Amino acid sequence: MPPTSTSVEPGKASTAAQDKGSTVRLLLRAVLWVGGVLAAGVISLLMVVAIALAVAFPNLPDISDLSNYRPILPLRVLSSEGILIGEFGEERRNLTPIKQIPKVMIDAVLAIEDAEFYEHSGVSYKGFVRAALANLGRAKSQGASTITMQVARNVYLSSEKNYMRKIYEILLTFKLEHMLSKDQILEIYMNQIFLGNRAYGFSAASAAYFDKPLKEVTIAEAAMLAGLPKAPSAYNPISNPKRARSLQLHIIERMQENGFITPAQADMAKKQELKVKVGSDNTKVHAEYVAETVRQLMYA
């Protein structure tokens, strides 16, 4: 049988070529249009940021005083034996230099708040990406603030949430990182942060919740205290023990994941039964009249 050959009519071939060309042109137009919109969006965003920076930067507060950090401390009246008999002031705080803060307390805070604190320049771009991915499909957002950003916010800015305040926060963060060392920033954070029960800073919180100096806290106690910055009332081990316990266990796991503690230490910390202090009185001797007399003499 002789071979058969197929042929395409010239009109149909021309029509197919025209259709293909039209499709390609349509796709090119769509790509160019999308690219133009994205480019315009990026340019507009850069212009908005530039204007915001021009407005915000000259109005940034002077942070030179933080190089010699001296927070407000309560008036404490001690006996001749050094026993506390009276404390006056709205804020409980014990200023503790960074070198005197135990490593276990620092590790617990870094594990839950900012594990890359000593690596980033104030803003953790990895943290932003992780938070954005974690927030997809979640009703409740997950934050990405570094410790430096929290210092900038807690010391100088209001709690109001808007884009302008966020710009101020980021600018202040870079300014803090430029002027202060990492240890200085961490020292301010560890002493300044509110932790509930009128306690500011982890030294005061250790006394308020466990009735012991900060240098004596265990891994389990440090993990419990490290959960307080997120929400001091919600994770208060006195008023909300179940929620506090849940976060404490998570922090212990984070400490292990980041290499701060061994698996054996983590297991032991999870099993430790904490003795939480009930009551807000830190005085060992009740001599209120004497303490009040001293206060009046001091402010006379």
Regions found by a protein language model. Give the residues of each.
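Short, glycine-/polar-rich solvent-exposed loops and beta-turns at beta-strand/coil boundaries
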Residues: 68-69, 88-90, 121-127, 144-145, ...
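N-terminal type II signal-anchor transmembrane helix
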Residues: 1-78, 116, 136
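Flexible glycine-/small-residue-rich
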Residues: 77-79, 132, 227-229
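Structural motif marking the loop-to-transmembrane transition
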Residues: 19-31, 35, 125, 144, ...
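Non-catalytic, structured segments within soluble enzyme domains
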Residues: 138-300
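Flexible, acidic/glycine-enriched loop-and-adjacent beta/alpha segments
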Residues: 97-147, 203-204, 210
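Terminal hydrophobic membrane-targeting helix
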Residues: 55-108
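Short small-residue beta-strand/loop micro-motif enriched in glycine and branched aliphatics
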Residues: 85-87, 118, 233-236
